[in-house]
Amino acid sequence: MKTPIDPDIVKKFITASGLKSVGLASIRELNRLVTNIEVASGVSFIRMEMGIPGFDPPQIAVEGEIEALQQGVGSKYPPFDGIPELKAGIASFVKNFLNINVAPEGCLPTVGSMQGCYLAMMVAGRRFEGRNKILFIDPGFPVNKIQARVLGLPFESFDVYDFRGARLEDKLRTYLEQGDIGAILYSNPNNPSWICFTDKELEIIGRLCTRYDVIALEDLAYFGMDFRKDYSQPGRPPYIPSVANFTDNYILLISSSKSFSLAGQRIGMTAISPVLFNSAGDNLEPWFGSNRFGYAYIFGGMYALSSGVCHSAQHGLARLLEAVNSGQYNFVEAVQEYGERARVMKKLFTDNGFRIVYDLDEDEPLADGFYFTVAYPGLTGEALVEELLYYGISGISLATTGSKRLEGIRACVSLTGKELFPELKARLVQFNQNHQ
């Protein structure tokens, strides 16, 4: 059976990797394996395994950072809860695009949104005695569960696929009624499935968080990237949906990596509800020196993790937020091509025997965006990941994300420009022919 990549090379590096199962490898492990096969074979892959921005960072952020470095900030420790202009910029950004009021004191940069999630779980899981468990609404970013394990926090999880709409309430109650959940973590839009929670679902999550005094950790890594609506105009509807409309128990975790293409600078944003920030817990002081939530979060939590986010990166992001908040820079328009890529790539897959796994938001077709999910008849997602390596195509198994849809894989569109579509099509045609 002829394949684009020499089978002997693929097998050699799979064996050398020592992985028990290629299809269950972590994103970073798979990324290293694919790179090794690429180098040895001389054949470039269609790289869909890792969510890496496919565009250059905005020039205004680059210039802001260069200017700050030229002014000498590189020799100075930054405020570890953020420079004042960035804190104010984050608060304005949340108001302009979510229509939610947060105070600058509750806004802080983190070393990427990944650190933001880690910090949020660390503090939320220790707010009350006996309520240290994290509930993950899956599928989700695999590393978040690793973070919970490292923190020593127990967790529960469920795949939301069969619990959309009103069914979500009963499912959440089965966990919350146990009385040991400290926080609920989910991403919206969702990584890996690209489902987007509806206002009905966010209202359920928010209302139950208030009822059971649980914190909603809302991972907005793909901020404004549900391209079915235009969320690009500051201070004007439609506003990006958020659980913050339905509860005061929220922490918003906003990435700069995808929406702003600033992945390399490792700077994310956290916005804490003013009510939560000024609240108290009975178990924070032993861990963070104070039972006051906001004080514990910053002076006990953030300070323990870092002496602050890169000083110049803070200035670059602050400059960018100023442009975004004023309407000078349209960040949604800058990344809208991801949606067009997804639309074309989905069709290339479905034209060649694949089907979309997560395909609906309740009764509405899923948006075209940064990720999509596919399956092929007769293969599990675990097997499909390995089989596609012989065709120079890489993705990750949904099994690694907490999904119960074990037949599927996640594909990221960011590194597949339009110039690669003919090659992707040819490889998928060959794959389908070889598996008839």
Regions found by a protein language model. Give the residues of each.
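PLP-dependent enzyme catalytic core of the Aspartate aminotransferase-like
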Residues: K2, S92, N96, I100-V102, ...
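N-terminal small-domain helix-loop-helix segment of the aminotransferase-like
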Residues: T3-V10, S17-Q115, L321-Q328, N434-Q436
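Helix C-cap/helix->beta junction micro-motif
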Residues: S41, L151, R211-Y212, Y391, ...
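AMP-binding (ANL) adenylation modules
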Residues: G54, S257, D361-E364, T400-S403
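Conserved core of the PLP fold type I
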Residues: Q70-Y212, L217, F223-F246, A426
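Conserved core segment of the aminotransferase class I/II
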Residues: F246-Q336, N432
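Short hydrophobic/aromatic beta-strand micro-patches
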Residues: A271, T373-A375, C412-S414
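Conserved glycine-rich beta-strand-loop-beta hairpin in the small C-terminal domain of fold type I
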Residues: H311-Q314, A318, F331-K346, T350, ...
